[in-house]
Amino acid sequence: MSKLKEKRGKIVVSMERVKKEEAIELARVQIEKTFGKGSLIKIGESSVGKGIKSISSGSIVLDEALGIGGYPRGRIIEIFGPESSGKTTLTLQAIAEVQKEGGIAAFIDAEHALNPVYAKALGVNVSELWLSQPDTGEQALEIAEHLIRSGGIDLIVVDSVAALTPKLEIDGEMGDSQIGLQARLMSKSLRKITGILSKSNTCIMFINQIRMRIGIMFGNPETTAGGNALKFYSSLRLEVRKIEQITRSGSSDDVIGNKIRVKIVKNKVAPPFRKVELVIYFGKGISREAGILDAALKHNLIQKTGSWYSLGNNKLGQGRESVVEYLNKEVELANDLDKRLRKIIFNNFDQEDVNFIKLKED
């Protein structure tokens, strides 16, 4: 008797489910008539649920930390930090990676400070890079919106938020009080940009500067320019800090680069709060080989015994710098290690990210 009741109960639930599905389908038809096809979809029947495409950062250790193999497409990214910490270098390296894959990038230079010679040294094809040097913040963000709506741009870099000066401020007197103008400009623009980004699959990066909040006695007095809107709308926020200078071997005064630390303070596409250290050489950009060495050591493809590094039974060299230089010369070996590492890392991340998503749902 109990089994019969249970069976009848399941039939009733099933019929209710069918009625609900029919009602939703009628609503969907009406919604699509009003707002257009694709206004209401099931995630499983669309590209939304099929993973997030990414743009490589140019460093395998940073790609690993980001969780999906690079910067997510269709999202807003903020890169912030003190002056000369490597923020622009990170974005130019991303542009170079996009162009290597046949993509198109644009650089909105609100600071009017882009150095094409340096960009070219980092691997950017400057002859194919779209450049805008706007006069006002409104102009910069409207240009970004038009580029996103075009659907033809893969990556947009805005340098920087602090330089996006509202027109009212430019037209006004030096002594005029213009409280909150930039914050309102950013909030209004980001509301418009967010909705169209995912449809165009464009990634937009905002470089930002650090400001000090006056009167803060406890806690961190640092904040970023442009108000809170960018913090909220960003899917990814990277804090970049210079931690030490790199000098030429045998010299304490001949500085050839910087070591920087990148902390992922916000990540909506993978677990956040990861930290990585990157090497940036002046005139060359991020050291891809140093990243490969660090990742290979972490995943046991390369072994270290004392000061010696070896790959299987083959010794690569003594000392970190000599091995990085060796990988720089042996391009085929470096490429092979990069491919093997990406296979190891991102096969592992698949399951980790699934667990992370389940944890968030719980």
Swiss-Prot record:
Record Gene3D superfamilies: P-loop containing nucleotide triphosphate hydrolases
Entry keyword annotation includes Metal-binding: no
CDD domains: RecA
Keyword set, alphabetical order: ATP-binding, Cytoplasm, DNA damage, DNA recombination, DNA repair, DNA-binding, Nucleotide-binding, SOS response
One Gene Ontology CC term in the entry: cytosol
Cited InterPro entries: AAA+_ATPase (IPR003593), DNA_recomb/repair_RecA (IPR013765), DNA_recomb/repair_RecA_CS (IPR020584), P-loop_NTPase (IPR027417), RecA-like_C (IPR049261), RecA-like_N (IPR049428), RecA_ATP-bd (IPR020588), RecA_C_sf (IPR023400)
Family stated for the protein in its record: Belongs to the RecA family.
Cellular location(s): Cytoplasm
Gene Ontology MF annotations: ATP binding; ATP hydrolysis activity; ATP-dependent DNA damage sensor activity; damaged DNA binding; single-stranded DNA binding
Protein name (Swiss-Prot/TrEMBL): Protein RecA
Keyword Transcription regulation: no
Function: Can catalyze the hydrolysis of ATP in the presence of single-stranded DNA, the ATP-dependent uptake of single-stranded DNA by duplex DNA, and the ATP-dependent hybridization of homologous single-stranded DNAs. It interacts with LexA causing its activation and leading to its autocatalytic cleavage.
GO annotation terms (biological process): DNA recombination; DNA repair; SOS response
Binding sites annotated in the UniProt record for ATP: G81, P82, E83, S84, S85, G86, K87, T88
A Pfam family recorded for this sequence: RecA
